[in-house]
Amino acid sequence: MNHEVIVTCAVTGAGDTVGRHPAIPVTPKQIAEAAIEAARAGATVAHCHVRDPATGKPSRDVALYREVVERIRESDTDVIINLTAGMGGDLEIGKGEQPLEFGAGTDLVGPLERLRHVEELLPEICTLDCGTLNFGDGDYIYVSTPAQLRAGARRITELGVKAELEIFDTGHLWFAKQMLKEGLLEDPLFQICLGIPWGAPADTTTMKAMADNLPPGATWAGFGIGRTQMPMVAQAMLLGGNVRVGLEDNIWLDKGVPASNGSLVERAIEIIERLGGRALSPAEGRRRMNLKPR
């Protein structure tokens, strides 16, 4: 069991939640304010995507990331900044017998292009999504090939940024460990991502199986989406891991009650404390994760 817990808040994500929740952060100002709100509620880390301010759709615009990061860094919080580097892997294959006629949802770029904002802004942590995945129903695939992952891992290491390896299924963990064997990564973090169709399900058996297969001594966290978010907070802590909550993964605090990032962090910390633990401050989290000063 982990008694000193890193709490990550994923504040907006890239999902189709705008319009289903009254206050999904969309503009850089809103996203930065959400990260600051999470920090004030007790989060150790803020995990950030950006969205097109006009449409709310996910974006890779470096200028949007720059504004978010600058606003957080200029605030009175010292929350650890974790930027996604998973955008640019979206492939919507064509319908029926025309799979090569890619759909409008396709946004597919190379591994270094996915890291342009990381190269410029040098966050303390960035993500690396460790495998290809059938993402939801229909014809949408998230593409992250072994060659792309090796190139991304090398570049993240060169930049001195801590890699958070996003593990959506057991094969992703297998390949993440292979990259470690090849010396492509230095002391990465592992994030066990459960309940995203059609990766690994969010249940006790699955999280334990994946946690049991992590490299010895690895720093890891786990989360579930939707109604499994808080049960997986308890599960990850009991298994010795850290936790993640936030509007990226769950938009409800209780049935019929929209959540905020701050309220989700507070609920997670309540669970942690009731189990006899405590949330780490950003300064403590930096020491735990051996982060390089920025």
From Swiss-Prot:
Known cofactor(s): Zn(2+)
Gene3D superfamilies assigned: Aldolase class I
Pathway: Amine and polyamine metabolism; carnitine metabolism
Record keywords: Metal-binding, Transferase, Zinc
EC number: 2.3.1.317
Induction section of the entry: Highly induced by carnitine via the CdhR transcriptional regulator. Not induced by glycine betaine or pyruvate.
Biological process terms in GO annotation: carnitine catabolic process
One GO molecular-function entry: metal ion binding
Similarity-based family: Belongs to the BKACE family.
Protein name, entry field: 3-dehydrocarnitine:acetyl-CoA trimethylamine transferase
Organism: Pseudomonas aeruginosa (strain ATCC 15692 / DSM 22644 / CIP 104116 / JCM 14847 / LMG 12228 / 1C / PRS 101 / PAO1)
Organism ancestry: Bacteria, Pseudomonadati, Pseudomonadota, Gammaproteobacteria, Pseudomonadales
